[in-house]
Amino acid sequence: MNQEIKKILKNSLITSLIVLVYGIVVRNPIVYFGMFVGCLISTFCFYMICQEAESAMKSGSPFKMTVTGYMKRYAIYGIYLGILVKFFGFPVFLGGAVGLLNIKFNIFLKVVSTQFEKIKKKLSSLK
């Protein structure tokens, strides 16, 4: 697995732990149940994507493998969000939806920090 992917997974787990600690401190089930579990599911599904990509490269039918993986991930998302709406209500559902954006947030931060470092390097070379 690529080092950047490992770093994204590590940062995602750290973000999940921060969300859990924050949820426990404020004693809010929206945060510690909805967002934390959403963060974990997001991290797990990103790991599934990485594993499927590696095995699709070695497989004879990568299209079928990736489509079924895609459907599995969205079924996991749908079941999780459906359970939240049905049993815990709309606010916890929104917290879970925000938690599912954990990987996307960490990838965004990685891209922004990389761009910031490039700009900083260009500015320092101008001096």
Curated annotation (Swiss-Prot):
It comes from the Bacteria. InterPro entries: ATP_synth_I. It comes from Propionigenium modestum. It holds the Pfam family ATP-synt_I. Its main location: membrane. The ATPase of P.modestum is of special interest because it uses sodium ions instead of protons as the physiological coupling ion. The keyword Nucleotide-binding does not apply. It is a multi-pass membrane protein. A possible function for this protein is to guide the assembly of the membrane sector of the ATPase enzyme complex. One of its GO terms (cellular component) is plasma membrane. It is found in: Cell membrane. GO terms for biological process: proton transmembrane transport; sodium ion transport. This is ATP synthase protein I, sodium ion specific. Belongs to the bacterial AtpI family. Keywords: Cell membrane, CF(0), Hydrogen ion transport, Ion transport, Membrane, Sodium, Sodium transport, Transmembrane, Transmembrane helix, Transport. The chain crosses the membrane at residues 5-25, 30-50, 81-101.
